[in-house]
């Protein structure tokens, strides 16, 4: 399995984002609104309205941080970051098994990312589960950590048992277009790959 886990945000940056998001409770809506036909049947979470000021402002911050990070640039060869949104899952919420759409209105999705805005000790459950033909791995990230993986991987988020899981998700259109070539590139050594 090919993926990158990297510390993208520090504690101060996380707290600034969370403070902004907490200002606008009315802007959180049913996550099914942006899901594809299959994903909408298995998606049970909340997401921040992409047109809200809090979403626009903090999406720009995340976009800038990703594009300026050398480890991420070396791993993903990003042409464009798109579809950024903030989601949260509280008790009993989850996101069933699905594959991200390869083409979205905002761009091509070669790589998917999840950026954690909550330290893992503040919630139970809520593991990101990534599957390939040969393996399945579960991830619970620390606050500020980002995981990047091929959008073609089957993945899900297990039910949150306690607490609240707050993340930022989005997609990367890479300069490496072909799936086969992308996989070849992703197997090249990178200091942050695990």
Task: Place the predicted regions along the sequence by residue.
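Conserved small/polar residues in nucleotide/adenosyl-binding loops
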Residues: 184-190
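A short, well-structured alpha-helix characteristic of acyl/acetyltransferase catalytic modules
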Residues: 14-24, 29
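Signature of the catalytic double-stranded beta-helix
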Residues: 20, 35-105
